């Protein structure tokens, strides 16, 4: 088997672009992604302007978003038919009241081409409540399947492996690409793996170790965000 074409896909919770922006930009530029799937993109006043500025600082273009998730692309790279959807967070009973655990979330994805093969990239950010996350994941997976393509799903899952979200992803037949990648949170002393990269059957991929990427330093990783990124390489093999 010989190596075929590849795509570099960066999944990164950028903490609302509120930490050391220069450090964050150095990390992203060193990773040199074709696509950056962002969680906690800047929002509220001047949302689009901020996201375009953030993308420009990374050397990328802002092309699609839903809630606080965004997709950025490198020059010469396209995202076809982006799909955005709200992820509604259920009400839970707190004593005598029903309250929402968080504001509605979102997921965003799109079709891309790898070596003439269509696939989908999807990014999400699940909530803090364990029951809510399961309900949210149902909605995310429904969106993933609506592409009718093999897909890569990445995001901040707010849960460690062994929890119901991870179990559900495994039951769907998805491959956990980060199983050997190590913890992703907190960036200055990572002890929890709460960020995921899951691949559907029909695709091949791996997470590139951060310490193997020239220009990525521990200091910049700790300063740029509270999460560590995951750089995924998707490949097709030819005989």
Identify the role of each PLM range.
Residues 77, 82-84, 145-150, 159-239:
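Metal-dependent phosphoester-hydrolase catalytic domains
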Residues 35, 40-118, 210-214:
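Structured beta-strand-rich core segments of catalytic domains in phosphoester-bond hydrolases
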Residues 109-113, 118-120, 134-157, 165-166:
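His/acidic metal-ligating clusters that form di-metal
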Residues 1-57, 70, 138, 236-239:
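N-terminal, active-site-proximal structural segment of metallo-dependent hydrolase catalytic domains
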Residues 14, 41, 124-126, 155-157, ...:
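Active-site metal-binding loops of divalent metal-dependent hydrolases
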Residues 23-27, 53, 135-142, 164, ...:
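Alpha-helical elements of Rossmann-like donor-binding domains used by nucleotide-donor carbohydrate transfer enzymes
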Residues 36-39, 64-66, 152-156, 176-179, ...:
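Active-site neighborhood of phospho(di)ester-bond hydrolases with catalytic His/Asp-centered motifs
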Residues 17-20, 42-47, 129-132, 157-164, ...:
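Active-site environment of divalent metal-dependent phosphoester hydrolases
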């Amino acid at each position: 088997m010989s190596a075929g074409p590849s795509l570099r896909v960066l999944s990164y919770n950028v903490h609302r672009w509120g930490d050391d922006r220069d450090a964050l930009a150095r990390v992203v530029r060193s990773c040199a992604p074709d696509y950056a799937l962002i969680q906690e993109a800047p929002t509220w006043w001047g949302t689009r302007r901020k996201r375009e500025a953030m993308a420009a600082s990374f050397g990328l273009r802002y092309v699609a978003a839903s809630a606080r998730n965004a997709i950025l692309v490198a020059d010469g790279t396209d995202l076809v038919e982006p799909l955005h959807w709200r992820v509604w967070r259920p009400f839970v009973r707190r004593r005598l009241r029903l309250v929402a655990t968080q504001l509605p979330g979102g997921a965003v994805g799109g079709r891309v081409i790898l070596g003439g093969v269509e696939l989908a990239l999807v990014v999400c950010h699940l909530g803090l409540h364990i029951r809510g996350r399961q309900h949210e994941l149902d909605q995310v997976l429904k969106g993933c399947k609506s592409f009718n393509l093999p897909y890569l799903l990445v995001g901040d899952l707010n849960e460690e492996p062994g929890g119901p979200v991870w179990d559900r992803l495994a039951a769907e037949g998805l491959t956990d690409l980060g199983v050997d990648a190590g913890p992703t949170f907190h960036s200055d002393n990572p002890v929890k793996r709460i960020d995921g990269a899951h691949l559907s059957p029909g695709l091949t991929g791996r997470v590139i170790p951060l310490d193997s990427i020239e220009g990525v330093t521990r200091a910049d990783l700790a300063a740029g965000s509270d999460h560590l990124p995951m750089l995924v390489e998707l490949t097709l093999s030819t005989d």
